[in-house]
Amino acid sequence: PSLFREQNNPKQAMVIPITSSERRNYIPMDFVPHTTIVNHSLLLIPDCPLYIFALLNSQVHNAWMRVVAGRFGTDYRYSSNVVYNNFSFPELTETQKQKLHELGQNILDVRAKYPDSNLATLYDPNTMPLPLRKAHQKLDKEVAKIYNKNWDLDNESEIVSDLMQMYQQLLTTDNKNIETTETEDEEIEDEETTEDDETTEHTDNKNIETTEHTDNKN
């Protein structure tokens, strides 16, 4: 979630179209240079690493998007809060990050072989080049492997069901952390209150002793 920032001119950013045709298997995401002015129809992740680009371009993330995203007519409406923030990103080793980096770069390299085709054409199911489709399928298999799931990639309901369980586990963990923090805060407050009471009592005792001593003198 922290990757999303409001910047008009980052050094380099990955852009995600807010609306995308329901006919596409993958939302066409891309990188843009700092000279590009991004308008309100795009979300951007400044200085996005290629392994994040790869994860977001995987079928796993797109399956999640198809279930939780809003709609604009029949098109999907991507949201950083609903789709991105609630997606269960896997914990990655450096080796896995490097592998995803390579697969993400492979997708960009294959796209570059079709300079006369824009992303709309490249990601139209009827015109998507076979090498690009294979590059995505290779990425999809690697991402499923990283999640340590024996998913049937033709069955997105199975993928989403597991992602929903991961999401619920994250919520449970977050709630436990919140409860633990609140309990610790209450304990600190109780300790401070006890110390204040002891200080007050000690002061009162001194005052009483002083008063008694004065009375005895009199």
Q: Regions from the language model: what does each represent?
A:
Residues 1-198, 217-218:
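S-adenosyl-L-methionine
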Residues 205, 210:
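Functional cleft and adjacent loop/helix regions within the main domain
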